[in-house]
Structures are given as C-alpha cells and as structure tokens.
C-alpha cells in the first residue's frame, strides 16, 4: 500500500457539525504547501522516500549545507523537515508542492507529533500511582513505594520520578472530517499529540479499517 503524507502545524481544537447533524470535536491542522526537497532512491540512498519541508526559515538562521539543500529545490530553507516512506516516487519530483488536496473527507490517517512537556514530575502525576494516607500519623504521602529488599539494583523501566512528556507519539487511525484546500486546513476528528503551534506529520493510516 502506497502512503501519502503532508507536514502541518497544529492550530487547536474546535467542533463542527457533520451533514447528518452530529457534533464532532476536531483538531485544526494548518497545512501550508509542502515542498519536495529530495527524492531518495534505493540506488543512491538504500531506500525509497521523499523529503518534505514546510515553514520558511530565514537564511541568516540557516547553515550553508541547509541553504544549498533547499536551493536544489529552488526554495527557501525550511523549519520542519521530515521523510515519508512507501510513496509512489514517480508522482514526485524535487521542487514539487504537496497540498491538502491529497486527502479527502473520510480518509484514515496517522498523526505524529511531540507531546507536551511537563518537566520533572513525581509518580502520582507521571504514572498515575496512588498516594498514601494523608492523616492519622502516616508519614508516607506521595513518595514511590518500596522496590523490595532482595534484588539490590533498579530494573530498567522502573517507574520513578523523572521528566514527563516531550516524547514523539503517533495517534493511529484518525478520520479526516474536512480537507479545506483554499484555506490550507485539515480538520481531523479527535485530538492529536502536541501543543498548539507545534509541527505534526499526517500520513495515510497503516491500520485503516
């Protein structure tokens, strides 16, 4: 199955009515025209993919290699660059624009983004653990529980206080409610990872029903 994909920026959430009168919560994703910066082939790169870029970046903030890479596509340096695999390479050439019209209402997509960062958090906030008694002489409230007395080491993956969020996550099998080509907007049913104004990747779902 060939994949279609586009890069965008999360605007926020709202709700719209469908033709049947159902009120649906949607995430608004702004998808300005993406530029194909590179077409990767098995002969040159060992795998097939296209490299897309979106959101112009000032040249003074860009190093020389990135400027030259963008110049090959006759465009300006881009702030957000990602690769899309399993595409039909014959449909793309360097410098082409990819717009919102590659998707239509009803399409199933996977959306990848960076989740909100919450900083250093304890077990109760980070992992949903239960707190201890807050009264009657208890001196155990919000601390991690005992790890046992025998093992003499901490297992990998042990749930302990630490940095929460700011991970790459993918929401699978979301439905596109509307694809507005004139305004460069996709309305996606439900929520997608990341804060408002963060970049996301929208691709054809790998588990579409």
UniProtKB/Swiss-Prot annotation:
Keywords attached to this entry: Ribonucleoprotein, Ribosomal protein, RNA-binding, rRNA-binding
InterPro entries associated with the record: Ribosomal_uL3 (IPR000597), Ribosomal_uL3_bac/org-type (IPR019927), Transl_B-barrel_sf (IPR009000)
Annotated GO MF terms: rRNA binding; structural constituent of ribosome
SUPFAM superfamilies (alphabetical): Translation proteins
Record's GO cellular component terms: cytosolic large ribosomal subunit
Cysteine disulfide partners in this protein: none
Swiss-Prot/TrEMBL GO biological process terms: translation
PANTHER family associated with the record: 50S RIBOSOMAL PROTEIN L3 (PTHR11229), LARGE RIBOSOMAL SUBUNIT PROTEIN UL3C (PTHR11229:SF16)
Protein family per UniProt: Belongs to the universal ribosomal protein uL3 family.
NCBIfam families membership: L3_bact (TIGR03625)
The protein's name in its UniProt record: Large ribosomal subunit protein uL3
Naturally occurring in which organism (per UniProt): Lactiplantibacillus plantarum (strain ATCC BAA-793 / NCIMB 8826 / WCFS1)
């Amino acid at each position: 199955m060939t994949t279609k994909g586009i890069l965008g920026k999360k605007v926020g959430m709202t709700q719209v009515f469908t033709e049947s009168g159902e009120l649906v919560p949607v995430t608004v994703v702004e998808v300005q025209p993406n530029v194909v910066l590179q077409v990767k082939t098995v002969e040159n790169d060992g795998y097939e993919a296209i490299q897309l870029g979106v959101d112009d970046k000032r040249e003074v903030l860009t190093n020389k290699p990135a400027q030259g890479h963008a110049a090959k596509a006759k465009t300006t340096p881009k702030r957000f660059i990602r690769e899309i695999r399993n595409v039909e390479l014959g449909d793309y050439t360097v410098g082409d624009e990819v717009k919102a019209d590659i998707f239509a209402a009803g399409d199933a997509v996977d959306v990848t983004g960076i989740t909100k960062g919450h900083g250093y958090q304890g077990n109760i906030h980070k992992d949903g653990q239960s707190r201890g008694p807050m009264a009657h002489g208890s001196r155990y409230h919000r601390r991690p529980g005992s790890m046992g007395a025998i093992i003499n080491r901490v297992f990998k993956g042990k749930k302990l206080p630490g940095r929460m969020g700011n991970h790459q996550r993918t929401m699978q099998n979301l439905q596109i409610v509307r694809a507005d080509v004139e305004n460069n907007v996709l309305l996606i049913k439900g929520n997608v990872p990341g804060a408002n104004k963060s970049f996301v990747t929208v691709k054809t779902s790998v588990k579409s029903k």
